[in-house]
A protein has these predicted regions:
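Redox- and metal-dependent alpha/beta enzyme cores, enriched for Fe-S-associated oxidoreductases
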Residues: 2-67
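Glycine-rich phosphate-binding loop plus the immediately following alpha-helix
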Residues: 182-186, 268-295
């Protein structure tokens, strides 16, 4: 973790996703635990203060790469945090991004509680890409089978306008699918679509081997076994339908994304903006209604 000071919410987000933070080199990240000499208190205290990671607004940070070398064998990636209008850190990020052979993700916040939700998708997608790079599997585990000996997996995409669900069997064949309006509470629409799609498929809840949620409301679906970012889902889906796809553009509701894939359909890199209504279903509906146009 590097860059400008970040909130506890960001650190909690990382730790809740199983991230081991090797070091916190933000300007307020290192612990202020000073071991001073009682006989030379002032000089010892001053020495400890001057050896803290400095703010880039005050002094140029040096020897950061030497510090990171000690973690090289355990360092999978770097989350670089900046605060809005604190532009000094963007220059250091650009320099490190080009010189270090380490995956890096820069996130910018405005020190408010709301911004933590905005960066959740990109942070989780970054973590997923790092796990895949290490050979870990996203959304794969030993699955139980239904009473008929078959395996069924349910996927739920919770969007701003609609909640979509599909059940696949072990041969990746569609058994049933359904679409309902999301409404005010994504959790309630997810419960409703679960009931409807099971009825369509003629299955019971215990017949489903795995439930995976995605979309902006994925964390609001309590019965999901796993939640995966739409970035990783885009990569898997595009590669399944066309293995030659290397670039995906997603004009979404909360943000827009540009995603780069490798030959295996794995997310190599991605960029996002923070605010975008271009692909929001409700925004499009309101504009169509205002312009008196049919969709």
């Amino acid at each position: 973790l590097m860059g400008a000071r970040c909130s506890k919410g960001i650190i909690d987000l990382l730790e809740n996703r199983g991230v081991d933070i090797l070091f916190d080199m933000t300007c307020t990240g290192l612990k202020r635990e000073f071991h001073v000499e009682p006989d030379n208190l002032l000089q010892a205290y001053a020495w400890q203060l001057l050896n803290q990671v400095p703010c880039l607004r005050m002094v140029k940070a040096v020897n950061r790469e030497n510090y990171m070398e000690g973690f090289r064998d355990r360092l999978d990636g770097i989350l670089y945090h900046t605060v809005q209008f604190c532009d000094n850190y963007a220059y250091e990020y650009t320099d490190l991004k080009h010189r270090l052979d380490i995956p890096m993700l820069m996130v910018e916040t405005d020190a408010t509680k709301q911004c933590e939700g905005q960066i959740r998708t990109r942070v989780e997608a970054f973590i997923e890409s790092l796990k895949i790079a290490k050979g870990a599997s996203i959304g794969k585990k030993s699955l139980k089978k239904a009473e008929d000996g078959k395996m069924y997996v349910l996927g739920i995409d919770s969007g701003s306008t609609s909640t979509n669900a599909v059940i696949l069997n072990e041969n990746k064949e569609i058994v049933a699918f359904d679409v309902v309006r999301t409404g005010a509470k994504s959790g309630e629409s997810a419960e409703r679509i679960l009931s409807e799609i099971l009825e369509r498929a003629g299955l019971k809840r215990e017949d489903i081997s795995l439930i995976v949620s995605t979309g902006y409301g994925r964390v609001s679906i309590p019965f999901a076994d796993e939640n995966v970012t739409e970035i990783s889902c885009h990569g898997r889906g595009a590669h399944y339908f066309n293995p030659d796809v290397r670039t995906i553009l997603d004009i979404g509701g909360q943000d827009s994304k540009a995603i780069r894939l490798n030959e295996n359909g794995e997310v190599v890199d991605f960029v996002m903006n923070d605010k975008c209504a271009a692909g929001t279903g409700r925004f499009l509906e309101m504009m169509a209604r205002t312009l008196e146009m049919d969709i």
